[in-house]
Design a protein with these regions (language model features):
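Conserved phosphate- and dinucleotide-binding cores of soluble alpha/beta proteins
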Residues: 73-181
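N-terminal active-site beta-alpha-beta segment that forms phosphate/nucleotide-binding
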Residues: 2-97
Length: 181
């Protein structure tokens, strides 16, 4: 949905080679990988919730600094299971936990990494259950970082919170340690 909003925003005035190339650059922008380097000064234990291609890109790129990734199952759709399996295929130590076990594993982690389906000036949208995970991380004083392509940044006025659907929720940006683009 965000990609369609960005298309509309990007080409509202004109379609030219320049605007097409600018949009292609936006689609392929993975600057978040380099910008995440500040997180990996030493070996880390990471908690994730749901599945994000940006988070996966970062973990794979910095895998020599990753001790273990704990992936929440992220029910009801269970994206965390496939994420944990894919990390193992990339020779990254990972474990799958049930969402309700998160409070047992956060204390031993260094930080939580999340992706986002959309990011506005006040909120970000992600899989249902993300808010609970973020609040648990705060309780245990663990930083939470959202890794995202700049493509996911949109104006709040362009996003309909009513159309989030049953599998997504809005989380206040003030709960996040930092957004890495």
């Amino acid at each position: 949905m965000v990609a369609i909003i960005k298309l509309k925003e990007h080409f509202s005035d004109e379609i030219s080679d320049k605007t097409i190339n600018e949009f292609k650059n936006l689609l392929s922008d993975k600057s978040y990988i380099e910008n995440a380097s500040l997180l990996f000064d030493t070996t880390k234990k990471i908690i994730t919730f749901s599945r994000s291609s940006a988070v996966e890109d970062v973990i794979i790129y910095y895998k020599k600094y990753v001790d273990k990734v704990t992936c929440c199952h992220s029910l009801p759709l269970g994206e965390g299971k496939k994420f944990a399996e894919d990390l193992k295929k990339n020779m990254i130590s990972s474990q799958l936990i049930e969402d309700g076990e998160l409070s047992r594993f956060i204390p031993d982690s260094d930080f939580m990494l999340l992706g986002a389906d959309a990011i506005t000036e006040d909120l970000f949208m992600n899989k249902i259950g993300t808010l609970q995970a973020v609040l648990l991380a705060q309780h245990f004083k663990k930083p939470v970082y959202v890794i995202s392509s700049p493509l996911k940044k949109i104006k709040k006025s362009d996003y309909s919170l009513e159309k989030l659907g049953q599998y997504f929720e809005a989380i206040d940006n003030s709960l996040i340690t930092d957004f890495i683009y």
